[in-house]
Amino acid sequence: MRRAPEDTNGTSTTAGRLVARVAAVIAMTGLAALMTAGPAVAQAGALAALGSPPDPKVPVSWDRYYDHAAVEDIGRRLEEAYPDRCRFGSIGKSYEGRDIWLLTVTNFRVGEADRKPAMYIDGNIHSNEIQGQEIALYTAWYLCEMADRVPWVSDLLDDRTMYIVPTINPDGRAAFIDSPNTPSSPRSGVAPRDDDGDGLFDEDDLDDLNGDGHITMMRRRDPNGRWLVSREDPRLMIRARPDEPGEYEILGYEGFDNDNDGRVNEDRTGYYDPNRNWPWLWQPQYVQSGADAYPTSLPETRAVIDFVVNHENIAGAQTYHNSGGMILRGPG
């Protein structure tokens, strides 16, 4: 989240107040805990609800991850159910031609969306960090469903606009969900790149050798190896203590030397990092791995920048990653 600027008196500006208000939405809806929605709980004052509505107009199961078509379906159903509260559209196209979906949530009966102070929210820029999409999508759904039930949510949408992009990286997300993968790959998008400089593109990717739908580590028995099989789960390996013999060596992830260059899995899908492709403090590939050829070389980052630049009412932003367990605020 970019930190809100302060005025000359040291008090938060509109951006700061907006960020604080949206933080309340995040806290109240349980988004920080991956949307573990509970029953409605009466609370004093403005904090009047916790969890999800018992009878939503747009029923959505939040115990699963959704593909591109399902996100479109949810977005269009929200727009149909709440025509004065939600607009569903796209900010651009991905490399493979998928729409980068946008939900604009506000009270359209009270002022124009683009003339209210706005919060921009996105997620899932890294294709393996898929939870970000559902958190962003849940935010839009929760605001639409709860505005008629909770006064402070209604007030928020009267005065503010939420621009919500569930995933910046729909191609990478689809590849991560639909194809065999490791927990950390693919992390980028899917535009071909020549990672090993041999003139070929993505020719030595991971290979699902046993056809189980997963890319896992390979092991081989070796009396000089330093790994043991876990007694609790035979799929797990435990490093042997210095005073005990090992039984296996780890060979790396499943794969062949597809291009016969003596290396395995060295030119995978991508690789670039969309989150290193922004103009701010951009560095070339040899300094910052994944930066790609130049800032905004990727259609996905270009679409986000164009949208933000063309919406001067955006006063704060939140982008969802996973695994860090922290909220990072930029300087300023």
Residue ranges and their predicted role:
Residues V22-T36:
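Bacterial N-terminal signal peptides
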